[in-house]
């Protein structure tokens, strides 16, 4: 099941395969498809940073993982929680100009940010409770937006879909 797709700055198409624990790439010139097994379970959404490295959610493992296509190396970053495993990162996106990975925390009613250069985390509590955010997107100034799922409605406190505007602290 392909689940998540992005294009790196070099034009290569990358995708995650959720139930096979793989990521893959498609060379746009040759059409060649390359599959790579991941050392973690449940690769879900992935995005590329400005340097062409991929950031991938490890949904059932409470982590995000960086993959460097140049070295084929995976580097794991556990979400900053105690106890470990207490959140499920459904999706992420990379604010390329600022080098920040934004991660949806679906059991904590929050978003996490990961500063790529410093490898440091921040946690941003959301103004709503019992949320299940699905993705993150940005304005040019770095303001982030996340959406609360609308289906099934019991995922959210009042059953209403919501768009939330978030500023990084």
Q: In which residue ranges do the predicted regions lie?
A:
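Beta-rich, blade/repeat-based domains predominating
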Residues: 1-10, 39-51, 61, 82-98, ...
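Blade-level signature of beta-propeller repeat domains, shared across WD40, Kelch, NHL, RCC1
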Residues: 133-169
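Surface-exposed loop/turn positions within WD40 beta-propeller blades
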Residues: 10, 19-20, 30, 51, ...
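A short loop-to-beta-strand structural motif that recurs across blades of beta-propeller domains
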Residues: 21-25, 62-66, 109-112, 159-165
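A short beta-strand motif characteristic of beta-propeller blades
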Residues: 32-37, 73-82, 120-125
């Amino acid at each position: 099941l392909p689940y998540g797709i992005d294009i790196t700055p070099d034009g290569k198409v990358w995708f995650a395969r959720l139930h096979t624990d793989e990521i893959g790439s498609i060379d746009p010139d040759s059409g060649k498809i390359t599959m790579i097994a991941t050392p973690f379970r449940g690769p879900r959404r992935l995005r590329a940073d400005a340097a062409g490295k991929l950031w991938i959610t490890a949904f059932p493992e409470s982590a995000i993982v960086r993959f460097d296509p140049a070295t084929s190396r995976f580097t794991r970053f556990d979400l900053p929680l105690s106890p470990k495993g207490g959140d499920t990162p459904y999706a992420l996106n990379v604010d390329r100009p600022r080098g920040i990975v934004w991660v949806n925390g679906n059991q904590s009613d929050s978003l996490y940010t990961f500063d790529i250069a410093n490898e440091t985390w921040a946690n941003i509590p959301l103004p709503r409770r019992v949320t299940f955010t699905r993705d993150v997107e940005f304005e040019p100034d770095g303001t982030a937006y996340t959406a609360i799922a609308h289906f099934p409605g019991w995922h959210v406190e009042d059953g209403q879909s919501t768009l939330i505007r978030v500023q990084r602290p």
